[in-house]
Amino acid sequence: LNALVAADAVLIPLHCEYFALEGLADLVGTMRRVRGALNPSLEIEGVLLTMYDDRTNLGQLVARDVREFFKDKVFNTIIPRNVRLGEAPSHGIPAVLYDAKSRGAAAYVALAREMLARRAA
């Protein structure tokens, strides 16, 4: 709660799974209450779809529903489900250094570029 009171904006990473949508609804409700009482300038920087597996209907459904609700707040960059992303923290190394050529690392680099482009616009 303290972080939401102090923040200007929130980047919401969202696993492309059903229960994550419930957590997202709770977070949005909490943000609404914080905005109403303590931090009227709090906004959503963006929603980042993570752990996305395009081979599953659920992943596609969650991505579609989130895009319909949040529209342009959803980043175009999607972080795929990727083994190398899961391995990197166990070695204490950022994913972009652990395996810079992995799909996951490339996605995070693309996210950084997208965030910078949004801020410049």
Outline where the language-model segments fall.
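Conserved catalytic-core segment of NTP-binding enzymes
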Residues: 1-83
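A general structural signal for short secondary-structure boundary/capping elements
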Residues: 38, 92-96, 121
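C-terminal boundary of histidine-terminating zinc-finger modules
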Residues: 88-110
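C-terminal alpha-helix
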Residues: 110-121
